[in-house]
Curated annotation (Swiss-Prot):
Name of the encoding gene: IZH2
Spans within the Cytoplasmic topological domain: 1-78, 132-153, 198-212, 264-276
Protein name: ADIPOR-like receptor IZH2
Location in or out of the cell: Membrane
Inducing stimuli: Regulated by OAF1 and PIP2. Highly expressed in presence of glucose. Expressed at lower level in presence of glycerol or glycerol and oleate. Highly expressed in the presence of saturated fatty-acids such as myristate.
Keywords, sorted A to Z: Fatty acid metabolism, Lipid metabolism, Membrane, Receptor, Transmembrane, Transmembrane helix
Length: 317
C-alpha cells in the first residue's frame, strides 16, 4: 500500500514540476516533461517520420528503443488503430489456421490437400496482417527499422495476393489441373518478382519507381487471365460459380477503394487535424483490406464446398 502511495505522490510531483508549480532545477523539469510526454506534433518529429502532412498530431517520436516502442501499444496515438485493425484479425486467421479441422466443412471426399489449400490462404492472410501490424508498431523506433518494416509490409501484400489467387484458382480449375498449374506458376512468378523489388534497396530508388509500379500493376492484371480463360473453357455462369466471381470481384473493389482513399489522403485532406487519431485514410484502407480478405475467404469456402458437392454427386472426379 505504501508503495502505491509513493508512486501516486511521485507522479503528482512530476506533474507539478512539469507544470512549473514546484521549485526544481531545469534538468529535473526537463526530465519530468520527458517522462510525461508521449505524443508529438508534425513539426516536432524528425523528417524521416513525416509521411502524411494532413495528420497534425498524435505522433510517437523516434524512440530508438524496442521497449519504448512496445509500450506504445498501451496508449492511444495516430498509429494505434492501424496496429490493432490488423493485429486482431491476424490473430483470428492464425486461430482458424490452427483449428482448421473444426472450421472447414468436411465431406467424404475431403483430403489433406483441401486443408493445405485453404490453410495456404489462412497463412497468407495472417502473414500479411501481422507484418503490417508489426510495421505500424515498430516504425517509430528508427529510420532503419521503419525502412525494414516497410519492406516486410510490402512483402506481406505480395504473399496475400499469391495465396489468395492460388487457393481460389485451385478450385476454380479443379477439373483442369494443367491450367491451374500454369496460372499458379504465373502468379507465383509475379509474386517473387514483386517481392524482390520490394526488398532490394536498388529497386526502391526513385528512378525505379515507374518500373516498380508497372510490375505491381501487371501483377494485379494477371488475375484477369484466368477469368478470360475460364470464359473460354466454361460458360459464364459456370465460371461465375466455380471461381466465385462475386466474392472475388467484391474483394477487389474493396482493395481498390481502400487504395484510392489512401492515395487521395481522404478524409484527412479536407479537414487536417480532425482525423489524426480516428478515421484517417490509412485506417480506412486497413479495414477495407480485412473485409476484402473475408470476402475472399467466403468465396474460397463456397468454391471448395461446390467442388465436393459435385464430387459426391459424381459430377466431377
Amino acid at each position: 500500500m505504501s508503495t502505491l502511495l509513493e508512486r501516486t505522490k511521485s507522479v503528482q510531483e512530476l506533474k507539478k514540476r512539469a507544470a512549473g508549480k514546484t521549485s526544481a532545477n531545469p534538468a529535473e523539469v526537463a526530465k519530468a516533461k520527458k517522462v510525461l510526454r508521449r505524443l508529438y506534433s508534425w513539426d516536432e518529429i524528425p523528417e524521416w517520420q513525416r509521411d502524411n502532412d494532413f495528420i497534425l498530431h498524435g505522433y510517437v517520436k523516434e524512440t530508438s528503443s524496442f521497449i519504448e516502442t512496445f509500450k506504445s501499444l498501451f496508449y492511444l496515438h495516430n498509429e494505434s488503430v492501424n496496429i490493432y485493425s490488423h493485429l486482431i484479425p491476424a490473430l483470428g486467421f492464425f486461430t482458424v489456421l490452427l483449428l482448421d479441422k473444426s472450421t472447414i466443412k468436411v465431406f467424404a471426399t475431403t483430403t489433406w490437400l483441401d486443408h493445405m489449400v485453404i490453410d495456404l490462404f489462412y497463412s497468407g492472410a495472417f502473414a500479411c496482417l501481422i507484418l503490417s501490424s508489426s510495421f505500424h508498431c515498430l516504425k517509430s523506433h528508427s529510420l532503419r527499422i521503419a525502412t525494414l518494416g516497410n519492406k516486410l509490409d510490402y512483402l506481406g501484400i505480395c504473399i496475400l495476393i499469391v495465396t489468395s489467387m492460388v487457393s481460389i484458382l485451385y478450385y476454380g480449375y479443379f477439373e483442369k489441373f494443367s491450367l491451374f498449374c500454369l496460372f499458379a506458376l504465373i502468379t507465383v512468378s509475379f509474386g517473387i518478382a514483386c517481392s524482390i523489388v520490394s526488398l532490394k534497396d536498388k529497386f526502391r530508388k526513385r528512378e525505379w519507381r515507374p518500373y516498380r509500379a508497372g510490375l505491381f500493376v501487371c501483377f494485379g492484371l494477371s488475375s484477369i487471365i484466368p477469368i478470360f480463360s475460364g470464359l473460354y473453357c466454361y460458360s459464364f455462369s459456370e465460371i461465375w460459380t466455380q471461381i466465385q466471381l462475386f466474392w472475388v470481384l467484391l474483394g477487389g473493389v474493396l482493395y481498390i477503394i481502400g487504395a484510392v482513399l489512401y492515395g487521395m489522403r481522404f478524409p484527412e485532406k479536407i479537414c487536417p487535424g480532425k482525423f489524426d487519431i480516428w478515421g484517417h485514410s490509412h485506417q480506412l484502407f486497413h479495414f477495407l483490406v480485412v473485409i476484402a480478405a473475408l470476402c475472399h475467404l467466403r468465396g474460397l469456402l463456397n468454391s471448395y464446398e461446390l467442388v465436393h458437392i459435385k464430387m459426391e454427386n459424381g459430377i466431377v472426379s
